[in-house]
Amino acid sequence: MKIYEVTFNWNGENEVHSFWENAQSSVEKFIENMTRRGDLVFVSKRLVKEI
């Protein structure tokens, strides 16, 4: 399992989400789902810890 910090930009403000990646959920899918509506813009992802 990997823990990521994913940063999005919303109305000029950065917003950081923690995301736990496992076999059922990938960080790329999470980013795709979060940005689908168009008001969040993906900024960066950072691997915090691998368990």
Task: Label every PLM stretch briefly.
Residues 13-25:
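A short, exposed loop/beta-hairpin motif centered on an aromatic-Gly-Thr core
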Residues 5, 21, 50:
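Acidic-residue sensor for enzyme active/binding pockets
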Residues 1-15:
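Short aromatic-glycine-(Arg/Gly/Cys) micro-motifs in beta-strand/loop hairpins
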Residues 24-33:
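Short, surface-exposed linear segments at secondary-structure transitions and domain or protein termini
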Residues 32-51:
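Short, mixed-charge low-complexity intrinsically disordered segments
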